[in-house]
Amino acid sequence: MILNLDTNIFNHGLSRHNILAFSQGFPIGLPCRNWIEVGLRLRLRLLLELAVGNFPQGFKIHLSGSFQAVRLALFSSFTSLRTDELLLIETRPSYLSSVQGLKYYVIFIDNYSQGSVGCSRN
């Protein structure tokens, strides 16, 4: 299954980035190990935005490919963000509730060249 990705430019207050936005989230019935092939060749920062409200609980997000660093930004607002270096994001309720007012997962990928993003059930 290939998911539709909306590609656009988004200004979140830090700088401008290329974005692949999962605006509708993943389907609830998404099979395990279903990968989204990003396949872009960029030397800019790529930003993957996941709407938490549309994302089913009990899934993990995996990243693979060629990049220098991955940081997860947890947005409680567009001016307040925290970054952690993570390669795996879990949608456990306790994790999602650890940040008050959390609305988005945003994944920053530095010096991305090519790879894929996918998810699997916990």
UniProtKB/Swiss-Prot annotation:
Query: Superkingdom of the source?
Result: Eukaryota
Key words of the record: Mitochondrion
Which Gene Ontology cellular component terms are annotated? mitochondrion
Where does this polypeptide localize?
Mitochondrion
What's the chief localization of this chain? mitochondrion
| Presence of the UniProt keyword Mitochondrion in the record | yes
Q: What else is known?
A: A stretch of 270 kb of the mitochondrial genome is duplicated within the centromere of chromosome 2 resulting in the duplication of the gene. The expression of this duplicated gene (At2g07706) is demonstrated.
Query: What is the name of the protein in this document?
Result: Uncharacterized mitochondrial protein AtMg00470
- What organism is the protein native to? Arabidopsis thaliana (Mouse-ear cress)
